[in-house]
Amino acid sequence: MDFNASLRRAIKTGDVILGQNNTEKCIKEGKAQMVVIAANCPENFRSQLGSYENLFIHTFEGSSVALGKACGKPFMVSTLAIVSPGESDILSLKRTA
């Protein structure tokens, strides 16, 4: 699976929430099926994520700049939540983890 292509497809055809505050709200509402964080995501947010049981977290190997580019955005993205994958196979990462 090409992660970047799957992520772009999820953004195009599904429901993906970008940004730390919006992701946190989405998690608290129980809508997030998966959370993706950049390698340089702030440590305090990472530790907050650890308190949520049954939340699948995927660490993107690049920086927030690289994650933004992978999303097709011209800005940094430190974290995002997959609410609905649409036509993407991105949730298959949960099965391989």
Swiss-Prot record:
Belongs to the eukaryotic ribosomal protein eL30 family. The gene is rpl30e. Keywords: Ribonucleoprotein, Ribosomal protein. The keyword Ribonucleoprotein applies. HAMAP family: Ribosomal_eL30. GO terms for molecular function: RNA binding; structural constituent of ribosome. InterPro entries: Ribosomal_eL30 (IPR000231), Ribosomal_eL30-like (IPR039109), Ribosomal_eL30-like_sf (IPR029064), Ribosomal_eL8/eL30/eS12/Gad45 (IPR004038). One of its GO terms (cellular component) is cytosolic large ribosomal subunit. It comes from Methanoregula boonei (strain DSM 21154 / JCM 14090 / 6A8). This is Large ribosomal subunit protein eL30. One of its GO terms (biological process) is translation.
